[in-house]
């Protein structure tokens, strides 16, 4: 690997962005690929295939070429608002899927290291919490508290910052009331419809782990709808 490419890789890792390393195995030439950015002209004719590998998080040699694609994809960021019982099962599923998890809950007796070991916990109100962290387009919000004082500011932030997945726990009636509050706060019907409520796919389950499974299944489905 040439020094110029190695330096570029180091810089991209410092920037904390998703990218791919493209290498011509025949001559050793290479470049960095980033989604929606111009590709080195030497690899232009492979751009469609490179995009496909990147979207599928796939490493390997493009068929019938000497072009090797190695992807470095940042994990999906999952912000769980409300350290309730369901959240413990959600965290377990999300960790298995290598998601980057943050629990947000101002109630320290719920959001504790004892209940959520080895998980990033922010014991602040959502508005304050999101000032500390850096969500991006690969961020998901799961609101679980049933408390408008906690859930609503988080939902508003997620809508305004284009989270790819936004879900909120509660009955149909609870969600109707939630939508009415958001509309009163100035959000459009189109924006409000971004929220999955009631959250989760219809598995028919009633227990905390079953509800958590329905939520994480819906989230994974939305991950791949982005592709």
What is each PLM-predicted segment?
Residues 1-117, 174, 180-183, 218-227:
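Segments forming oxygen-rich coordination pockets for charged ligands
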Residues 93, 153-157:
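A short acidic, amphipathic alpha-helical/loop segment
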Residues 100, 120, 191-194:
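Conserved beta-strand segments of alpha/beta enzyme cores
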Residues 119-125:
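Conserved SAM-binding strand-loop segment of SAM-dependent methyltransferases
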Residues 127-137:
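Short amphipathic alpha-helix with an adjacent loop that forms part of the alpha/beta core around
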Residues 140, 145, 156-181:
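ADP-ribose/adenylate-binding Rossmann-like module
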Residues 148-152:
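Beta-loop-alpha module in the N-terminal Rossmann-like domain of NAD(P)-dependent dehydrogenases
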Residues 169-227:
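Adenosine-phosphate binding glycine-rich loop
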